């Protein structure tokens, strides 16, 4: 597995949006869907069930992928794909 690193921007946005590093790592390791949006940049997403809200959401993770690492650029929640 490649090393996963988080940019300062990603960490700030994840805190603001209530997304944990654990959730992001889980999505990177087992994404429901992955799309390359430009060379080296991918968006990975997975459907998550929020037990407290009893709702289904998607978490999207944007990352720059290199030979040795995955650098998380940002992550956010959305209600649809």
List the predicted regions and their residue ranges.
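Ribonuclease/tRNase effector modules and their secretory precursors
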Residues: 1-81
